[in-house]
């Protein structure tokens, strides 16, 4: 199955995403802030789910940073 990275500032939502996707057989990593992402983690993920309305660095900024890490 897929390696999925979920980034959301809401801990309960991170838990829900993890539980739901793992039940379907996926491997899931969650982070509560975009700043916690590393190049290795971004390369590991087949799919990255981002909250676009996080405080501080929003999902759009995280997406731009991920692109710069993996280019």
Indicate where each model-derived feature is located.
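Short hydrophobic/Thr-rich beta-strand motif most characteristic of the beta2 strand and flanking loop
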Residues: 25-33, 39-40
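Active-site residues of response regulator receiver
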Residues: 51
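Conserved phosphotransfer cores of two-component systems
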Residues: 41-44, 65-71
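The feature encodes the CheY-like receiver
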Residues: 14, 55
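Residue-level signal for the "D+5" position in two-component response regulator receiver
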Residues: 30, 56-57
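Short acidic/polar segment at the start of the alpha1 helix of CheY-like receiver
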Residues: 6, 10-13
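Charged docking surfaces used in two-component/phosphorelay signaling
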Residues: 15-19, 23
